[in-house]
């Protein structure tokens, strides 16, 4: 940047200015007030300040002055403080005004500077031109007046121009510049050849030392090379014999490859000096070549000795340490080293042998190389080792020392071998020469890894021992003993022999389930025969049989120091009382020496002994030769011991199992050999009878059992397999493996490591499994006997997939895609049922998972497979429909927006009774009946007394009317009219006689299924005319007293996992907590997972149920249905029960007297408890009732996106009507009494409203509006208001806060409400406003994307002196892959001024402000352009203008 000019065009100097105080310590100090004067003085010599530095100075100055003011002003008066502040402000302002002017000027400062530079450059050029002209003119007038040119050199010019050369060049110049012509290549070769002949003649006639015999003559030179010392190149300067030799090049060949790092050992200056010295000798001496050799050879020997000395020092420093010492070193004479110094090693005291190596130069004959001497002299046992130790070819002191100690180590090993041969004349040790080692076999035959390796440490000369597997402490003791006295090796080898024998035994059985130890703690060790064995023994514990041991005793073999003999014993111990107490030895028995009698062979089905088997001797591997066996390690395998262990491990489990079977008095055939002696087995002759089954079933099961055999299998022989062979299987499954005449059942039992194999637990597990087989067999036997008479629908509905005596798997359904598995659980002593899906339905959830616990309890009470199939048949379709109901908790349904309510809670009460709780307020009881029907009633009424309500539930008004809309007219059950049920007409109806006759007749006898001959209580499978509930044993959830179809007799469910009683209702936990897996088809994949897009709430955790709401209707009067005689689903009294006259509401007030021989007149149920009377629906009707479907009677465009079932729509409408009644009491609305049931009437200042369920469908809540002044409203406006209430307010998802917001709108003044209705019309019919760019939606609750004025879900309409409401605008035109842009606009309408503006609400930090700013500007411009008139509302006009003119920037989203 150019220098900055201040006032009067002065540059600011870069270094001027003092320091101010108060600014940051790291910033440069600002200029003092007088900096401008100093800047003006230094402007010519300084380039000026950078603008950034100047700005920084000004800021620091202002900051420092402000800090001074903060320190000084508190001490001054108020007037002085104000004066100081004004002065500071004025001064600072003037300063920054100047800075501003300077910055504006600085924009053009660069251009001005460039122009100035160009002008200055042009001025300098003009000055140069003028000065040059002046000088040339002066030179012409003064210096060149008398100057003359020479005559032209015409001949030279002609030569150059014609010939291109300069032949007339003077000779003196030619000789000094142009070199002479070189000799030719032929002349050069001839000269060198002649010189080579002169050199050869000279060499022949001169005395040459023999060391210089390696020479080469070439190119007029002779090259002498002495390997390892030097290389010299010489020549002569003529053919005269007296001409001296010339030394051309000298190279020293001595190298230090170990410590030299590749660098030259002789400096170039030293070589130059030697070169001069040798050249002087060549000039003066009579024998120049001899003298040259002596001089160079002497220097190279001294250099080699020096190299060896440096290597020794490095060897001592880095590797050998004190193990090698320099005894003496004379430079150029000798080097003496000592190795294997025992005193240094600290192993002995006093005099110690010292081994020396001396390297010196022979003083008598200097021409010899370095001489090596050993003290004491090396033995002559191995000439190759001695010869290597006497040479030093590679100039390596370490190699020389290693060769020396290698020869001495070989001598020590020979001495040790002689000691071993004195102990054993047949010893078979060998010496390895690569690394000095003595290999001593300990136990013949011996592998290489089992031999004792004795090495000699080359550094110290000490013996080092190695034996695989031996601990280091023992090796250290052996080394110390042998190094002190080599004869001590003998007892150590004797001890190692027994140790190696133990290791061989351990290695032989390491793959077997055993634990080996040298000692064993026994409480009676001293008194038991085990104590008399030798000390060298091994205890082998059989891990699968922890009470048994194999003891191996090892003994010496006379006259065979390298062999052992083994004796084997079998020992049993008793279990210790405590873990830390020793066991007691019981039996000790020696194995036979010849074990051929222990090898079994099966022949003709009998166990016989054979003499043809191979003989296993005591010696595990006979000695084949006297040499140590090197190939392989099979000689270490003790096959006798391995055979003993394997035999005990195989046979003893069967012995234990046989003893347990005998103790339990279970007859068996004993241990038998199978498969040519390779396996064993135990066959049971009879299995004890089972408890809990009939004698007939036990006999049938015993007759069908052909064989029961126990075998051992598995890698560790810890798995028992009991094979059961059955014949005459009562059921044949569809599996191909179940089609043969006999069935094989395999029961597997794993033995724990802590338990002996073949113990009592195996037998107990087998008996439990046999009991499970018997229990299931009894049910299967009864089921098989009933199969010929099974109803056709059950035969088509189900099939037997698998029956393997342990489990019965049935597949059922139209596609056989569901499965049920039945098996007996011996731990819980009851049947266990599991459900699943197969085939194409695999992976889906079974619909009966909801009532799995109830099915299991029912089957355990009455284990009848036919009854179970009938229940599955009757409940599959209802449960499929029930599982489609939404069970996801939702937020914002009530005024407590943070509380989640579960839409539907499925509470199974029994296998055929399912209770549905809707939002913890209404309850629906569904009873699954036979013949494809269900009975539905209001579960809020008590099952025992219809005059009482279940705590926590409320009756659903109009439920009976709603359910009768789904009644199938073709159903056999006769029904009464809806009006007759809800509003009783005359005391007796047209079909009263049928009802009276049915009451006078005695109830039909419930005949149980007749037992077939030979069966035990089996039922026939023909379907009786009445329901199956009355033909089977009653479960605890069914009362024995007769009631309408036994529908009201369900008491609180039994079992620990049942749903809670209605008297203490809480939200039921999900089925997954009961061990039931709900698949996608249950609830989460239903259409109810998609909520209304205007609702901000998704799945959340459920909370507790809501409390009682004020004003809930109560019911009174006894329920006549509780005392009805036995009824069936086909009985018409299910819909119109006849109560006792004494309990009738009209009893005692009737003036008519009935004849004594006639039943009392029929009293229709009161409407308050009419819904407690069950309504019979077919399965298809129930599916329609519970299946999500569009709202009937509504145009698809008007209906919301929340798809729900008719039952949810009805209950939701009832809840909304209940909320509306409570809201009317809280808001400023006037309630109007109405005689119509289920109708709510109220009025506002301008409207009368009537709210009731739709009479056609009972699934929507409809509003009928009547204005007080008919002239103020148009019919289409009222229709829009009514349709908006039906579709947007009281429709799904049925939120109470939408009602609160709508009632606030109804209470608004007429002109405001009319504008809101126009906005509602734009929402309901968006296609009618094609000229608008946006669609509008009236937000009755605050959406989550709205400005944070209140929690989401709260009412979005506030009506006081000003009106606040929210609109959601959605852009019409959008690219298909992208979602349409939507914005939330909070609008506030001022009733006093009549202006419509956007509410000024703080936005979230991460939200965009572009869209709200544009909306606010459009609304402000509309207010300016269209000022409101008195009594006119501008809401709709402003909103319509906003929808027409709002355009977001491209790519921008709110």
From Swiss-Prot:
What does the record say about tissue specificity? Ubiquitous.
Q: Which GO terms describe its cellular component?
A: core mediator complex; mediator complex; membrane; nucleoplasm; nucleus
Q: Which residues lie in Gly residues bias regions?
A: 14-23
Region (Interaction with SREBF1) residue ranges read: 500-824
UniProt superkingdom: Eukaryota
Which residues lie in Polar residues bias regions? 1024-1054, 1092-1101, 1147-1156
Per the Swiss-Prot or TrEMBL record, what residue ranges does the short sequence motif LXXLL motif 1 cover? 69-73
Phosphoserine modification, residue list: 617, 986, 1112, 1119, 1128, 1136, 1144
Q: What's the short name of a Pfam family annotated to this entry?
A: Med14
Q: Where is this region: Interaction with STAT2?
A: 188-566
**Can you supply a Gene Ontology BP term from the record?**
RNA polymerase II preinitiation complex assembly
Where do we find the motif LXXLL motif 2 here? 1182-1186
Q: Which keywords accompany this UniProt record?
A: Activator, Nucleus, Phosphoprotein, Repeat, Transcription, Transcription regulation
GO function terms (MF aspect): nuclear vitamin D receptor binding; transcription coactivator activity; transcription coregulator activity
Q: Where in the cell is it found?
A: Nucleus
Q: Region Disordered: start and end of each range?
A: 1-34, 973-1167
Biased segments, Pro residues type: 25-34, 1001-1011
**Mind telling me which InterPro entries this protein's record contains?**
Med14_C, Med14_N, Med14_RM2, Med14_RM6, Med14_RM8, Mediator_Med14, RM3_Med14, RM5_Med14
Which family does the record assign? Belongs to the Mediator complex subunit 14 family.
Q: What does this protein do?
A: Component of the Mediator complex, a coactivator involved in the regulated transcription of nearly all RNA polymerase II-dependent genes. Mediator functions as a bridge to convey information from gene-specific regulatory proteins to the basal RNA polymerase II transcription machinery. Mediator is recruited to promoters by direct interactions with regulatory proteins and serves as a scaffold for the assembly of a functional preinitiation complex with RNA polymerase II and the general transcription factors.
Quaternary structure and partners: Interacts with GATA1. Component of the Mediator complex, which is composed of MED1, MED4, MED6, MED7, MED8, MED9, MED10, MED11, MED12, MED13, MED13L, MED14, MED15, MED16, MED17, MED18, MED19, MED20, MED21, MED22, MED23, MED24, MED25, MED26, MED27, MED29, MED30, MED31, CCNC, CDK8 and CDC2L6/CDK11. The MED12, MED13, CCNC and CDK8 subunits form a distinct module termed the CDK8 module. Mediator containing the CDK8 module is less active than Mediator lacking this module in supporting transcriptional activation.
Give the protein's recorded name. Answer: Mediator of RNA polymerase II transcription subunit 14
Which organism does this record belong to?
Homo sapiens (Human)
**Record lineage:** Eukaryota, Metazoa, Chordata, Craniata, Vertebrata
This chain is encoded by the gene named: MED14
């Amino acid at each position: 940047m150019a220098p900055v000019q201040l006032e009067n065009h002065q540059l600011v100097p870069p270094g001027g200015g003092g320091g101010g105080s108060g600014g940051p310590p790291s910033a440069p100090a600002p200029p003092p007030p007088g900096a401008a004067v100093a800047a003006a003085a230094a402007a010519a010599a300084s380039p000026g300040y950078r603008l950034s530095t100047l700005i920084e100075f000004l800021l620091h100055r202002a900051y420092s002055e402000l800090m001074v003011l903060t320190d000084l002003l508190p001490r001054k008066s108020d007037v002085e403080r104000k004066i100081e502040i004004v002065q500071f402000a004025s001064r600072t302002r003037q300063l920054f005004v100047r800075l501003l002017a300077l910055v504006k000027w600085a924009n053009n400062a660069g251009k001005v500077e460039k122009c100035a530079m160009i002008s200055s450059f042009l001025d300098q050029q003009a000055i140069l031109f003028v000065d040059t002209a002046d000088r040339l003119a002066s030179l012409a007038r003064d210096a060149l007046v008398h100057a003359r040119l020479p005559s032209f050199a015409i001949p030279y010019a002609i030569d150059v121009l014609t010939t291109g050369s300069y032949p007339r060049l003077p000779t003196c110049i030619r000789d000094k510049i142009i070199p002479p012509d070189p000799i030719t290549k032929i002349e050069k070769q001839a000269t060198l050849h002649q010189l080579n002949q002169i050199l050869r003649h000279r060499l022949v006639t001169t005395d040459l030392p023999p060391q210089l015999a390696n020479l080469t003559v070439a190119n007029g030179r002779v090259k002498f090379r002495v390997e390892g010392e030097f290389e010299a190149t010489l020549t002569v300067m003529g053919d005269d014999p007296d001409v001296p030799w010339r030394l051309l090049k000298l190279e020293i060949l001595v190298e230090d490859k170990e410590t030299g790092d590749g660098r030259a050992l002789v400096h170039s200056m030293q070589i130059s000096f030697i070169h001069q010295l040798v050249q002087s000798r060549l000039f003066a001496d009579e024998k120049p070549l001899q003298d040259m050799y002596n001089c160079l050879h002497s220097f190279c020997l001294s250099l080699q000795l020096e190299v060896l000395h440096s290597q020794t020092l490095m060897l001592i420093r880095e590797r050998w340490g004190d193990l090698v010492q320099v005894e003496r070193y004379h430079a150029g004479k000798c080097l003496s080293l000592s190795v294997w110094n025992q005193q240094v090693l600290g192993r002995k005291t006093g005099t110690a042998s010292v081994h020396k190596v001396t390297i010196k130069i022979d003083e008598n004959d200097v021409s010899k190389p370095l001489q090596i001497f050993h003290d004491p002299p090396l033995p002559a046992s191995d000439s190759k080792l001695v010869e290597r130790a006497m040479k030093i070819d590679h100039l390596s002191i370490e190699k020389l020392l290693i060769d020396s100690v290698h020869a001495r180590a070989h001598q020590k090993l020979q001495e040790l071998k002689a000691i071993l041969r004195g102990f054993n004349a047949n010893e078979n040790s060998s010496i390895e020469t690569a690394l000095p080692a003595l290999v001593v076999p300990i136990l013949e035959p011996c592998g290489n890894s089992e031999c004792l390796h004795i090495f000699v440490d080359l550094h110290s000369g000490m013996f080092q021992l190695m034996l695989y597997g031996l601990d280091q402490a023992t090796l250290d003791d052996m080394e110390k003993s042998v190094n002190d006295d080599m004869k001590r090796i003998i007892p150590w080898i004797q001890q190692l022999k027994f140790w190696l024998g133990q290791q061989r035994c351990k290695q032989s059985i390491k793959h077997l389930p055993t634990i080996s130890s040298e000692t064993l703690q026994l409480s009676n060790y001293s008194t038991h025969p085990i104590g008399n064995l030798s000390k060298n023994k091994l205890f082998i514990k059989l891990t699968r049989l922890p009470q048994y041991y194999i003891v191996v005793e090892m003994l010496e073999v006379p006259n065979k120091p390298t062999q052992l003999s083994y004796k084997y014993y079998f020992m049993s111990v008793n279990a210790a009382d405590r873990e830390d107490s020793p066991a007691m030895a019981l039996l000790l028995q020696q194995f036979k020496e010849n074990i051929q009698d222990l090898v079994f062979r099966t022949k003709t089905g009998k166990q016989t002994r054979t003499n043809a088997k191979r003989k296993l001797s005591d010696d595990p591997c006979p000695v084949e030769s006297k040499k140590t066996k090197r190939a392989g390690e099979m000689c270490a395998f003790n096959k006798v011991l391995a055979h003993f262990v394997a035999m005990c491990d195989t046979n003893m489990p069967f012995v234990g199992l046989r003893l347990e079977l005998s103790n339990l008095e279970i007859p068996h055939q004993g241990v038998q050999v199978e498969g040519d002696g390779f396996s064993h087995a135990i066959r049971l002759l009879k299995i004890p009878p089972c408890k809990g089954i009939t004698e007939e079933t036990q006999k049938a099961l015993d007759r069908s059992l052909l064989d029961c055999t126990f075998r051992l299998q598995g890698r560790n022989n810890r798995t028992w397999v009991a094979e059961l062979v059955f014949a005459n299987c009562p059921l044949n499954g569809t599996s191909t493996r179940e089609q043969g005449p006999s069935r094989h059942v395999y029961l597997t039992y794993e033995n724990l490591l802590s338990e002996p194999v073949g113990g009592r637990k195996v037998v107990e597990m087998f008996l439990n499994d046999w009991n499970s087989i018997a229990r299931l067999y009894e049910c299967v036997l009864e089921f098989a006997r009933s199969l010929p008479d099974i109803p056709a629908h059950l035969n088509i509905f189900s099939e037997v997939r698998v029956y393997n005596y342990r489990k019965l798997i049935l597949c059922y359904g139209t596609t056989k895609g569901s499965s049920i598995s039945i098996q007996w659980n011996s731990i819980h002593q009851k049947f266990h049922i599991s459900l699943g899906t197969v085939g194409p339905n695999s992976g889906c959830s079974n619909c009966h998972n909801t009532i799995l616990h109830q099915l299991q309890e029912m089957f355990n009470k009455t284990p009848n497979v036919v009854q179970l199939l009938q229940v599955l048949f009757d409940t599959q379709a209802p449960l499929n429909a029930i599982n489609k109901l939404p069970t996801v908790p939702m937020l914002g349904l009530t005024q407590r927006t943070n509380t989640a309510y579960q839409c539907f809670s499925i509470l199974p009460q029994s296998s055929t009774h399912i209770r549905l709780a809707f939002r913890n307020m209404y309850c629906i009881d569904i009873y699954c009946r036979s013949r494809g029907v269900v009975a539905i009633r209001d579960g809020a009424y008590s099952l025992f007394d219809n005059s009482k309500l279940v705590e926590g539930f409320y009756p659903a008004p109009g439920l009976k009317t709603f359910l009768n809309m789904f009644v199938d007219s073709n159903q056999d059950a006769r029904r009464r009219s809806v009006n007759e049920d809800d509003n009783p007409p005359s005391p007796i109806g047209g079909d009263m006689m049928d009802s009276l006759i049915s009451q006078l007749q005695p109830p039909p006898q419930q005949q149980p299924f007749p037992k077939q001959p030979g069966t035990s209580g089996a039922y026939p499978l023909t379907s009786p005319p009445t329901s199956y509930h009355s033909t089977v044993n009653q479960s605890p959830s069914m009362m024995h007293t007769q009631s309408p179809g036994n529908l009201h007799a369900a008491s609180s469910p039994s079992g620990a996992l049942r749903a809670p009683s209605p008297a203490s209702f809480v939200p039921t936990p999900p089925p997954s907590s009961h061990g039931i897996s709900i698949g996608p088809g249950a609830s989460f994949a239903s259409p109810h997972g998609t909520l209304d897009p205007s609702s901000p709430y998704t799945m959340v955790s459920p909370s507790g149920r809501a409390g009682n709401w004020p004003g809930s209707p109560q019911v009174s009067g006894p329920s006549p249905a509780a005392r009805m005689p036995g009824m069936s689903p086909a009985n018409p009294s299910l819909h119109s029960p006849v109560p006792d006259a004494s309990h009738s509401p009209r009893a005692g007030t009737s003036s008519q007297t009935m004849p004594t021989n006639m039943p009392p007149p029929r009293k229709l149920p009161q409407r308050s408890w009419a819904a407690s009377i069950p309504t019979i629906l077919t399965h298809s009707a129930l599916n329609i009732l519970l299946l999500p479907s569009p709202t009937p009677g509504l145009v698809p465009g008007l209906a919301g996106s929340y798809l729900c079932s008719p039952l949810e729509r009805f209950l939701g409408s009832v809840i909304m009507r209940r909320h509306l009644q409570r809201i009317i009491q809280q808001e400023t609305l006037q309630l109007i009494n109405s005689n119509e049931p289920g109708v709510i009437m109220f009025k506002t200042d301008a409207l009368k409203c009537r709210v009731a369920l739709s009479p056609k469908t009972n699934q929507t809540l409809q509003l009928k509006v009547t204005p007080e002044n008919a002239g103020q409203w148009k019919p289409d406006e009222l229709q829009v208001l009514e349709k908006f209430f039906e579709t947007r307010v009281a429709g799904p998802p049925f939120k109470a806060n939408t009602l609160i917001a709508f009632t606030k709108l109804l209470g608004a003044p007429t002109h405001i409400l009319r504008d809101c209705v126009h906005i509602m019309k734009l929402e309901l019919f968006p296609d009618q406003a094609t000229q608008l760019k946006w669609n509008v939606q009236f937000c009755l609750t605050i959406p989550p994307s709205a400005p944070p004025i209140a929690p989401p879900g709260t009412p979005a309409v506030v009506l006081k002196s000003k009106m606040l409401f929210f609109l959601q605008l959605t852009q019409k035109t959008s690219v298909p892959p992208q979602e349409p842009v939507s914005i939330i606009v909070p609008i506030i309408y001022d009733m006093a001024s009549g202006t419509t503006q956007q509410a000024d609400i703080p936005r979230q930090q991460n939200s965009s402000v572009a869209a709200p700013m544009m909306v606010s500007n459009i609304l402000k411009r509309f207010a300016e352009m269209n000022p409101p008139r008195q009594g006119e509302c501008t809401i709709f006009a402003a909103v319509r203008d906003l929808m027409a003119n709002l355009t977001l920037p491209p790519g921008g989203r709110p």
